[in-house]
Swiss-Prot record:
It catalyses: a ubiquinone + NADH + 5 H(+)(in) = a ubiquinol + NAD(+) + 4 H(+)(out). Keywords: Electron transport, Membrane, Mitochondrion, Mitochondrion inner membrane, NAD, Respiratory chain, Translocase, Transmembrane, Transmembrane helix, Transport, Ubiquinone. The chain crosses the membrane at residues 2-22, 29-49, 61-81. This is NADH-ubiquinone oxidoreductase chain 4L. It is an enzyme of class 7 (translocase). Pfam families: Oxidored_q2 (PF00420). InterPro entries: NADH_UbQ_OxRdtase_chain4L/K, NUOK/Mnh_C1-like. It is found in: Mitochondrion inner membrane. It comes from Microcebus simmonsi. It is a multi-pass membrane protein. Signal peptide: none annotated. GO terms for molecular function: NADH dehydrogenase (ubiquinone) activity. Core subunit of respiratory chain NADH dehydrogenase (Complex I) which is composed of 45 different subunits. The gene is MT-ND4L. GO terms for biological process: ATP synthesis coupled electron transport.
């Protein structure tokens, strides 16, 4: 396994660990989720370029589109929660209340 793949897998694991450790703040969770998506994008792009499989060149673009949609929805949710409650602590929110 080349060293670049090890570094990207380490970046994914670090972002996943950050997601598990800092899950009380919504902004930290969103940043860790973006880090995971970025490392998945880079790893899938490198894998496809190394395999030279021309039919799957659209897979990294599709992953990038999903990451952009996830970021937009996450930021909209963060703005909504911040406007309604004044903070982004997930543990203090009861989203089931009207």
């Amino acid at each position: 396994m080349p060293s670049i793949s090890i570094n990207i897998n380490l970046a994914f694991a670090t972002a996943l660990l950050g997601m598990l450790m800092f899950r009380s703040h919504m902004m930290s969770s969103l940043l860790c989720l973006e880090g995971m998506m970025l490392s998945m994008f880079i790893l899938s792009t490198l894998t496809i370029l190394n395999m030279q499989f021309t039919m799957s060149f659209t897979m990294p673009i599709l992953l990038l589109v999903f990451a952009a949609c996830e970021a937009a929805i996450g930021l909209a949710l963060l703005v909504m929660v911040s406007n309604n409650y004044g903070l982004d602590y997930i543990q203090n929110l009861n989203l089931l209340q009207c």
